[in-house]
């Protein structure tokens, strides 16, 4: 009986891949990414004494810019547009340390190592409230879950019940069928985004400093990405069990490596670059910039452009796979009539 079970397990390659791949993935994630203490804080030093003060900063402050002609207002703008994570204002008075509170662990690490004689000030999240930072990220997580898991299960269920094959023989274009199948999940995920956003603003008192138009643009592009994940998974799965397995393998890296839980700055370089390839990473960057900082359009445009590129690639691939699934399969019965065989005496 035991040998029979092992043979059955060996036939299910996706289960074997999940059993072997998931522990290895978790080991890598928690070994190289699960760190809350940030050791390098990208810093700008501004003011007349910028060069002198920069030389005296603790090693944790990675000085990326020294500008003696800039002032505190310029430093605040740099933080608002996510150009740096901390600014030291050295204008002759005791230095002032400005820290980006939207990056919770960066701010906490900076406050534990305040330069001697400096006065710290936390911007965008003065109380270092966890909910203020997490709610914008949770919007992306909920959209990711609904768009990936629920969509993939819904489409696979149609295939298991045979209704997807019925749609394939109806006088509808594959694109019409795809839009009809995806639209309900799009609307559900959009509704969830609105509900979570409203709850964050009303219940958790999360500030909203940016543009509602930019919020809508980020939300729509991210929806196309996650729905593309869901549809692509459904085309690669023969059952709901396989769809759940693939969805888990899609969700886990995005949750762990996007900066939602563990700060990107604390990750090893290779793992951090994996995080940069994940759409949730850029959605979170945009949401924190819109909600907490009121970042300028020019600062939010690069993450938005990356999301747009991902939406085109992922959703385009998903539609291509879905159209292939709907294409009529030629069977032996569909073959043309046999050529007559000449019988000779």
Predicted feature residues:
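Extracytoplasmic/periplasmic domains immediately adjacent to an N-terminal transmembrane anchor
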Residues: 1-133, 324-345
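Transmembrane helix-loop junction
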Residues: 153, 157, 170, 201, ...
């Amino acid at each position: 009986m035991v040998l029979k079970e092992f043979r059955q397990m060996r036939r299910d390659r996706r289960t074997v891949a999940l059993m072997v791949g998931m522990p290895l993935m978790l080991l890598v994630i928690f070994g190289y990414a699960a760190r809350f203490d940030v050791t390098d804080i990208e810093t700008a030093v501004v003011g007349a004494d910028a060069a002198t003060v920069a030389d005296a900063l603790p090693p944790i402050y990675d000085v990326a810019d020294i500008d003696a002609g800039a002032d505190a207002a310029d430093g605040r703008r740099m933080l608002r547009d996510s150009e740096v994570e901390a600014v030291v204002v050295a204008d002759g008075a005791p230095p002032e340390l400005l820290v980006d509170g939207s990056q919770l662990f960066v701010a906490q690490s900076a406050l534990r190592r305040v330069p001697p004689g400096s006065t710290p000030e936390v911007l965008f999240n003065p109380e270092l409230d966890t909910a203020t930072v997490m709610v914008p990220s949770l919007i992306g997580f909920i959209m990711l879950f609904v768009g990936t898991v629920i969509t993939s299960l819904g489409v696979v269920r149609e295939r298991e019940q045979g209704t997807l094959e019925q749609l394939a023989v109806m006088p509808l274009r594959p694109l019409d069928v795809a839009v009809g199948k995806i639209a309900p999940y799009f609307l559900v995920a959009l509704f969830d985004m609105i509900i979570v956003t409203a709850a964050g603003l009303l219940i958790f008192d999360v500030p909203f400093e940016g543009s509602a138009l930019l919020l809508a643009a980020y939300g729509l592009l991210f929806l196309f990405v996650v729905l593309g994940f869901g549809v692509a998974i459904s085309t690669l799965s023969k059952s709901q069990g396989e769809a759940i397995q693939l969805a888990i393998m899609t969700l886990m890296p995005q949750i762990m490596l996007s900066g939602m839980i563990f700060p990107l700055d604390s990750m090893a370089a290779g793992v951090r670059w994996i995080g940069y390839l994940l759409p949730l990473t850029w959605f979170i960057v945009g949401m924190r910039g819109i909600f907490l900082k009121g970042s300028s359009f020019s600062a939010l445009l690069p993450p938005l452009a990356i999301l747009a590129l991902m939406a085109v690639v992922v959703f385009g691939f998903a539609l291509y796979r879905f159209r292939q699934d709907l294409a009529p399969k030629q069977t032996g019965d569909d073959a043309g009539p046999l050529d007559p065989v000449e019988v000779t005496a």
